[in-house]
Amino acid sequence: MYNITDIRSMHFEVTSKCQAKCPMCPRRINGGKLNPNLILDEITLEKFGQWFDIDFVKQLDSFYMCGNLGDPIVAKDTLEIFQYLRKHNPKIYLRMHTNGSAKSIPWWKNLAEQKVTVIFGIDGLADTHSKYRINTDWSKIIENAQAFISNGGDARWDMIIFKHNEHQIDECRILSNQLGFKEFSIKHTSRFKDDKFDVLDNHNNIIDTLYPTSKSKSMITKVKKAQEEVLPMISCKAKNQSELYVSATGSISPCCWLDLEWMPEQSFSKNDYIEKIKEFPNLNNSSLKEIFNSGYFSKISNCWVTTGLKECSKQCGSFDKLNEQFIRITHEN
């Protein structure tokens, strides 16, 4: 598939912790109880330096801090890791995705000094945002974003669209421009399984219901079809971008989609992966070089032309849901 010297991009999950309770996030069951397979963990600066030496950092063109389960602003050493990367690779493109509802004003100003592009998940205005981004504070997010932007930070506004907030798209776009965001994006989520999504509390009581936009609804059939396909050939996004994914527990995979350990036991993708690949390599047990030399990545690419992998077919097969979900608008400010 690729060698360690080929890697130019890293998608990095610094923590699996988060203060929010977004209903469609896999951390929780419909926003209620924690996922029983979730391991709460985070990667410190010390551990990061042990796993990724300076020579490896220097070969990277880009570094994206996000992940499947946590939010970077909850981790202790997020800023320090960005400082480490900027110090040893002045030209690296640094990005982070966050709900933006934590950390102090000085912290955000310091982050801006590291030339990190920050994508804020802001799903509407003050009256609609927290319907999905439960346990986040819209006013605090805007305050943090303004502090970041005022110190020269490159901020982007990402808005997930539902029935309850689609009437605010234009207002959010205009506000994002007024506040100094460089880009405004809308995302029609593909996480609906049918025409509604029930939000649960910690006792499995339904406390709210989310409804899809017509665009999200139109993707339900496409996603179901993609989940059933096992294609002999795919166009691997991770390979095409020379990317590596690292989870907060230290597990390594080509992309965030193959980080399947936290998935429920009945997951078709997880069971298919375990049957065919049989391992989740981890930096707590082996060095990065040892994992690359183990043949793990070759196992994955060999599967594409033999048995196929369900998750690979789903994410990089005939239906490109990543591109279908997003519409991006660049501001000239």
Regions found by a protein language model. Give the residues of each.
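Recognition helices and adjacent regulatory flanks at domain boundaries
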Residues: 1-7, 20
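Radical SAM enzyme [4Fe-4S]-AdoMet core and its adjacent flexible, acidic
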Residues: 5, 13, 28-49, 58, ...
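Flanking scaffold residues of small Cys/His-coordinated metal-binding clusters
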Residues: 9, 13, 17, 307-311
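Residues at or immediately flanking beta-strands
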Residues: 9-11, 62, 93-95, 154-156
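Conserved SAM/AdoMet-binding glycine-rich loop
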Residues: 17-20, 27-31, 45-124
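Local cysteine-cluster metal-coordination motifs and their immediate loop/turn environment
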Residues: 19-27, 310-321
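N-terminal juxtadomain amphipathic helix
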Residues: 68, 302-307
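Terminal, non-catalytic domain-edge segments
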Residues: 322-333
